[in-house]
């Protein structure tokens, strides 16, 4: 079962600040969601252990040796033979897992807008302050947290953060009523937030809006944006998984030979435990003998586990954005509007979890002079040289760059002749020139344009018919050719 209770309260006010000509708006919002999730008839590994550890009474019956478990009704279990497990035994080793979660948010804000006059010059301004407090927790029961419910460990997640932010926006008219400059306006904005978890962050914006005449407008904005880590990014517990990852060193020293990459071969041989296995062989427990090279049996592969979770040391990610656009609204047909925008977005210190398989590959494919590198910290090995574990925690390590163009054409047919109502059409086309991802400063980067999820060309055409209360919409979407990354030549070994 899954029971969810949600409450939301919001209060707001707006008005004039006396006779100053300034206006204000203020609000307070509170929201809370509680969830109780209960599953049924899951395996109780702890009770199963107690049930197996049984002894025989003088009368031939059995009892659980653990006195505490016995006091709580432990039922000895017989796992041998068809039908040997009775309903009483079954009921002792099953239970109903429970998980409780809560998300709570308080937000209060005050904003004001108006004009500022300095002599003969007037410009517009807006300013505000915001206070936000958020907290959340997710608490699996004790067996789930210990991994004794027949599955992986599911840790508790408990965290909170609060922030106080303030912003100022200014709009300056520069030129108006001149040839080729019907209006020129400059806008600037600044915002600073102080987080209880990561400290202070700032965001800025600078833009120009140049109205040439009634038909043509040019616009451009340069800004810096910030995204703070979420509670989950910061406080998510380390979850266990038994998903294996490929070892670049596997097969070296065997008849198959393993990797042919010179960097991989050199780096693997520089790790003492791996080099020993490559030279002297590795023990195969399934066969009970030593086999050549660093060979992986099914048992070796199944023993690899991973840990995935948050990181209280993660910081904010920042983005530098640049846009430049042209708007055409022809006077001969006011129902037509055409906009063309070019954009470039660079995001640094991206909050992300790098794939463990990618990390270990980049660890060993690096030039020997830079080995071991930061990627190598995300895995450990047994003394035999085989992989033991991998980790993937939230970090600030990645870089994204998006660059492209958007074209939008809108037209409205007000008069459909004998057909009542109106018809609006909208065509939006996107050309993606660059979608670069770089895991960290040591990574040369990969351009994913043309791969699944990042087509070079996309388009969406919409027809919207309205007639009083009747609304009919028809959409069609075009996605350009894409390829699977397994067959796409990145030059990085995929």
Where do the model's predicted regions map?
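Surface-exposed, low-complexity loop segments enriched in small/polar and acidic residues
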Residues: 1-164, 179, 223-316, 339-406, ...
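Hydrophobic, lipid-facing positions within transmembrane beta-strands of outer-membrane proteins
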Residues: 7-11, 104-112, 164-170, 202-208, ...
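Transmembrane beta-barrel domains of outer membrane proteins
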Residues: 10-16, 113-115, 167-173, 207-211, ...
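Transmembrane beta-strands of outer-membrane beta-barrel pores
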Residues: 17, 28-36, 129-137, 174, ...
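Outer-membrane beta-barrel channels and translocator barrels
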Residues: 18-20, 117-120, 163, 175-181, ...
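Transmembrane beta-strands of outer-membrane beta-barrel proteins
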Residues: 22-26, 118, 123-127, 182-188, ...
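Solvent-exposed loop/turn segments connecting transmembrane beta-strands
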Residues: 160, 193-202, 318-320, 409
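C-terminal beta-barrel architecture of Gram-negative outer-membrane proteins
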Residues: 241, 423-494
């Amino acid at each position: 079962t899954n029971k969810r209770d949600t409450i939301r309260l919001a209060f707001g006010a707006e008005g004039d600040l006396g006779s100053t000509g300034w206006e204000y708006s203020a609000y307070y919002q509170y929201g809370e969601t509680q969830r109780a999730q209960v599953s049924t008839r899951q395996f109780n590994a702890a009770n199963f252990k107690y049930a197996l550890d049984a002894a025989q009474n003088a009368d031939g019956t059995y009892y659980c040796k653990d006195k505490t478990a016995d006091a709580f009704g432990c039922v000895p279990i017989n796992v041998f033979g068809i039908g040997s497990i009775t309903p009483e035994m079954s009921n002792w080793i099953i239970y109903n897992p429970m998980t409780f979660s809560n998300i709570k948010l308080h937000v209060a804000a005050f904003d004001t807008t108006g004009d500022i006059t300095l002599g003969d010059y007037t410009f517009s301004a807006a300013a505000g302050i915001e206070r936000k407090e958020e907290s959340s927790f997710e608490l699996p029961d004790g067996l789930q947290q210990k991994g004794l419910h027949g599955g992986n460990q599911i840790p508790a997640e408990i965290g909170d953060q609060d922030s106080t932010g303030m912003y100022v926006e200014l709009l300056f008219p520069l030129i108006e009523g001149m040839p080729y400059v019907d209006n020129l306006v400059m806008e600037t904005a600044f915002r600073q937030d102080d987080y209880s978890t990561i400290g202070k962050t700032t965001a800025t914006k600078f833009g120009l809006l140049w109205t040439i005449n009634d038909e043509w407008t040019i616009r451009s904005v340069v800004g810096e944006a910030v995204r703070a880590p979420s509670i989950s990014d910061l406080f998510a517990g380390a979850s266990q998984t038994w998903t294996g990852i490929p070892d670049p060193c596997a097969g070296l020293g065997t008849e198959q030979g393993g990797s042919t990459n010179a960097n991989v071969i050199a780096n693997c041989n520089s790790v003492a435990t791996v080099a020993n296995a490559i030279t002297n062989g590795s023990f195969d427990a399934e066969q009970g003998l030593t086999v050549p090279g660093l060979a992986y049996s099914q048992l070796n592969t199944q023993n690899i586990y991973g840990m995935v979770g948050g990181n209280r040391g993660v910081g904010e990610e920042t983005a530098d954005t640049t846009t430049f656009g042209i708007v055409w609204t022809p006077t001969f047909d006011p129902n037509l509007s055409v906009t063309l925008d070019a954009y470039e977005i660079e995001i640094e210190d991206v909050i992300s979890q790098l794939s463990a398989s990618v990390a270990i590959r980049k660890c060993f494919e690096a030039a020997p002079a830079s080995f071991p590198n930061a990627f190598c910290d995300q895995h450990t090995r047994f003394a035999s040289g085989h992989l033991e574990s991998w980790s993937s925690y939230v970090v600030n390590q990645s870089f994204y760059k998006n660059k492209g163009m958007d074209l939008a054409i809108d037209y409205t047919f007000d008069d459909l002749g004998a057909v009542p109502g109106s018809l609006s059409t909208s065509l939006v086309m996107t050309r993606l020139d660059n979608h670069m991802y770089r895991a960290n400063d040591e990574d040369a980067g990969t351009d994913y344009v043309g791969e699944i999820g990042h087509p070079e060309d996309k388009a969406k055409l919409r027809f919207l018919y309205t007639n009083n209360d009747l609304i009919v919409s028809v959409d069609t979407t075009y996605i350009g050719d894409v390829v699977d990354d397994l067959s796409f030549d990145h030059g990085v070994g995929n």
